[in-house]
Amino acid sequence: MLAGVLLLQIWLKCKYANVQFGEHGFNGDEFYLDFYINENFSTKQFAKIESDLNSLSSKLEGISQKFVSLDEALSFFENDQFTKNLLKKSNLNKFKITFFENKHFWIEDLTLTFIKKSFIKLLNVSVNYFLGDPSQLQLQRINGIFAQSKKELEQLIKENEERLKKDHRSLGKQLELFSFDPLIGAGLPIWLAKGTTLRNIIGNFVHHQQLLFGFNTVCSPVLANIELFKISGHYQHYKEDMFPAIKLDSQAMMLRPMTCPHHCLIFKQKRYSYKKMPQRFSEDSILHRFEASGGLIGLERVRCMTLLDNHIFCRADQIKSEIKNAFNLIQKVNKKFGFIFDRIDLSLHDPKNQSKFIDNPGLWRESESQMENVLKDLNIQYQKEIGAAAFYGPKIDFQFKTIFKKMITIATIQLDFLLPEKFDLTYIDKKNTLKKPVIIHVGIIGTYERFIAALLEKTSGNFPLWLAPVQAVIIPVNIQKHLKAAKKLYNKLLKENIRVNLDDNQDRLAKKVRQAIIEKIPLQLIVGDKEIENLEKLTCRGFKGEKITRISFNNFVKRVRRDG
């Protein structure tokens, strides 16, 4: 995919000497490139550009790559303020620069061997602020598909068309679930009424399962003194992913990226006996993480999120049973939503990367061994992922493959011996001495944002009746004649706790029916002359075109309650 980025950069540089490049990357089979020039592109130009790009790949003689220092890289891009900014923001010591003729390009993960013969299809052009910051200049973004044969390109285009139908970003707009606005900021989702209802339905189900599992609900602030995150180690190991500190009353405060430090302090409010262990806390936690703007993908990766967070404080002899129970809880809850995970990872630390993980080899050996033994006891197939652990401990990650063929983590179990040490957490054991508990972090469905993104892609927005934000829509045939009866039916259904809308637009019946289909509302109730005479008998139609049926009001309510 990055070969497509290079070809587009070369074409732009040859045509516009002063072009400047912003972020680039790929999602599945689709690449994108941000750039700044004093000319606006349109899709009408794509055919000519595609022809130029496809012929360009055969003319790349003499192309080469070289690793250089930051100072040398900056000198190559002296007149490109955006690339210079990106170079400075990266954490790299060496930079892979690609040279072609007298031009140079920075595409860090590019492999030249893939550029032999190209077939490119450009998909769209849009505008966005550099790094998602409204105070910055607007850049143009071109998305495209790169292939090495015509047959492959045709297949990728076909797959892309199918993906668009399932893309959670377009479905979110179509179903009026969520939106984004540059005045609020990149990666900061706005939940609309239907999306908020969907969140509440999901949350209510998960909260009930948490209660059955023995979790106590707590609530803690989104802000904390910077010292809290220094004690926990987040400031040292996670600072680059946290929002900058805010100065309040001469104190440095930070938006939390995780809830565990807060829950450690909640546990510390009381001295527990070994008989009262484990202690299980749950919270719908609002978190803020400063994700790179180029990595923001709809709800899948955002900067403000709500995590259904759970922490188990237990004795060492309870670790295995608590992890097994948490594993089964995750499977049970996600099965209700139709999820079968594509992969389960055992995420381990990388002993060569001491800056990313705590330096305690003995602790890592013990915690990683315990996690692996649990997976073996459960007879679970898993894949080891070196370097994917949390900085404080190993994880079991439940992975879902998106429509862009990218694995994302939906649920997780993490084992943590570190934070009890950091916060000096203790309980009283049988011998009346103080012992350190162990923390098990459990994300049953992860964040609402990512879970709903995955749910939309899995269902194409066709939610089962129990999960649909709007279960039924009432459609009066004629506003003048039938609206009064439709309103009466609407109020009757509301009293029965049915999630129902009333379409009181002046449009023709056929248009209202089409709109209900677009919004994927499971049931349509048509109110005409028959219903005016008797609202105890309803005319019902499924949005997928099921046969129109006559059903009593009571049986309709029973059906919705049964299936919903």
Swiss-Prot record:
The protein's matches in Pfam families, at most eight in alphabetical order, are given as: HGTP_anticodon (PF03129), tRNA-synt_2b (PF00587)
Recite the UniProt cofactor note for this protein: Binds 1 zinc ion per subunit.
Transmembrane portions of the chain: none
| Gene Ontology biological-process annotations | threonyl-tRNA aminoacylation
* Reported cofactor(s): Zn(2+)
Binding-site positions, Zn(2+): C260, H311, H441
Similarity remark: Belongs to the class-II aminoacyl-tRNA synthetase family.
Please give the function described in this protein's UniProt entry: Catalyzes the attachment of threonine to tRNA(Thr) in a two-step reaction: L-threonine is first activated by ATP to form Thr-AMP and then transferred to the acceptor end of tRNA(Thr). Also edits incorrectly charged L-seryl-tRNA(Thr).
The name under which this protein is listed is Threonine--tRNA ligase
Q: What is the lineage of its organism?
A: Bacteria, Bacillati, Mycoplasmatota, Mycoplasmoidales, Mycoplasmoidaceae
* Name of the gene: thrS
